[in-house]
Curated annotation (Swiss-Prot):
Protein name: Trigger factor
Alphabetized UniProt keyword annotations: Cell cycle, Cell division, Chaperone, Cytoplasm, Isomerase, Rotamase
Taxonomy of the source species: Bacteria, Pseudomonadati, Pseudomonadota, Betaproteobacteria, Burkholderiales
Domain statement: Consists of 3 domains; the N-terminus binds the ribosome, the middle domain has PPIase activity, while the C-terminus has intrinsic chaperone activity on its own.
Similarity section: Belongs to the FKBP-type PPIase family. Tig subfamily.
Underlying gene: tig
Length: 436
């Protein structure tokens, strides 16, 4: 008789399962006999230990596995018979009341996948982002590359300004007491690069070699050094050297230093344009994709399985803990990481995953082999040996699967853009690249 699956609420279901004690014992005895053929028991030759002795040593573990297996098969038959897709793992509780002596009974509580209704794509409003790379952006990038390769020359009597490398001694105290990391000698940094706190850089600006300055500095509340975060320190700095950054000329030697083998400056500029156009394209596509996915999630109204959300939350908690370990945080394993901090985003991710999966199935948006290869070849252009990168990805199934997932998302985005109400938005290059 097919077990009856009961609907509790929303996606939650319950079913009663039963297995025969006789069937369990029959399988247990069969497994014990198999173990007996090779079991090594002190005082007995291999395979000659009494079955009763093996029952005492191996029986409980074998019986546990057999019951789990038989209950698992009974559960699969029940949900298959009811044509249900189970989300996560069931919770099993033993039943004792009203159960015959020759039966083991359990109640399985579980969740099912929802019926995912893909929203009307023509009713969605999304934004397609674009940007333009002009000669000005190429020159701006060239200037950044020059600054990265600047030679610093000490200047007597020069007042420190942005772009200069300042070498100084500093010592800080809080309430008159020195603190860890608050003192250094001959410490170099380039003004204007944001390596130091803004108040520290502001204090150093305008000083010349040999000059000293005392100033207060309040550490931000979210400063990474927790022992000083939110507190005000008094710093004393003494400048030892101010060095002006001398930018290299844009010539053949400079072009060669950036990998342009022929030393051709115009070809270097063309390479720079190609690279920043590729990066700008990736960023605008990323913004467009985010707009599409946000619109899908906002319109996707259905329950999501709590089991899937909880699983995603736990994955994110574990990832956060691994990041703490990599940063060298002491006792990272015991640092409290509140799971509820990830709950909203995890629910969004699960909802989006279900929507995308259903949309791919309905519109047949699976990644085609030629699309995957084209994406790999495009990605490989970021490397010096693109052919090797292509071979590297094509030779490994898991790496190909990573690219297939990206292509699949691209297909979904394009499908939505083809049907939705699309607004075009130009993004200034500086803003797009985080330079504004």
């Amino acid at each position: 008789m097919q077990p009856v699956v009961e609907t509790l609420s929303g996606l939650e279901r319950r079913v009663d399962l039963a297995v025969s004690v006789a069937d369990v014992e029959k399988e247990v005895q069969a497994q014990l006999k198999r173990v007996a053929r090779t079991a090594k028991v002190p005082g007995f030759r291999p395979g000659k230990a009494p079955l009763a002795m093996l029952e005492r040593s191996h029986g409980p573990g074998i019986r546990y596995d057999v019951i789990n297996g038989q209950v698992g098969r009974a559960f699969e038959q029940a949900v298959d018979g009811a044509k249900l897709r189970v989300a996560g793992s069931p919770t099993l509780e033993p039943k004792t009341e009203g159960v015959a002596d020759d039966t083991l009974a359990f109640t399985a509580t579980f969740e099912v996948y929802p019926e995912v209704a893909v929203p009307d794509l023509s009713a969605l409003s999304v934004t397609r982002y674009e940007t333009a790379v002009t000669d000005a952006e190429v020159q701006q990038t060239l200037d950044v590359l020059r600054k990265q390769r600047a030679n610093f020359e000490a200047r007597e009597g020069r007042a420190a300004q942005d772009g200069d490398r300042v070498t100084l001694d500093f010592a800080g105290t809080i309430d008159g007491v020195p603190f860890e990391g608050g003192k250094a000698e001959s410490f170099p940094f380039v003004l204007g690069q944001g390596r130091m706190l803004p108040e520290f850089e502001a204090a150093a600006k305008g000083l010349k070699a040999g000059e000293t300055k005392v100033f207060p500095l309040k550490f931000p509340d979210d400063y990474q050094g927790k022992e000083v975060a939110g507190k005000t320190a008094e710093f004393t700095i003494t400048v030892k050297e101010v060095a002006e950054g001398v930018l290299p000329e844009v010539n053949a030697e400079f072009a060669k230093s950036l990998g342009q083998a022929e030393g051709d400056v115009e070809k270097l500029k063309a390479d720079i344009r190609t690279n920043i156009e590729r990066e700008a394209k990736a960023r605008t596509q990323g913004r467009t994709k985010a707009s599409v996915m946000d619109a899908l999630v906002e319109a996707g109204k259905f329950d999501v399985p709590k089991a899937l959300v909880d699983s995603d939350v736990q994955s994110r908690v574990q990832a956060a803990r691994e990041e703490l370990k990599q940063r060298g945080v002491p006792n990272a394993e015991s640092v409290p990481i509140p799971a509820e901090a990830f709950a909203t985003e995890s629910e969004r991710r699960v909802r989006l995953g279900l929507l995308v999966s259903e949309l791919v199935k309905q519109a047949q948006l699976q990644a085609k082999p030629e699309q995957v290869r084209a994406r790999i070849e495009e990605f490989a252009q970021n490397y010096e040996q693109p052919a090797q990168v292509v071979s590297y990805y094509l030779a490994d199934r898991q790496r190909r699967a990573e690219i297939e997932a990206i292509v699949l998302e691209d297909n979904v985005v394009q499908h939505v853009l083809d049907k939705a109400k699309v607004t075009e938005e130009k993004v200034p290059f500086d803003q797009l690249m985080g330079m504004a």
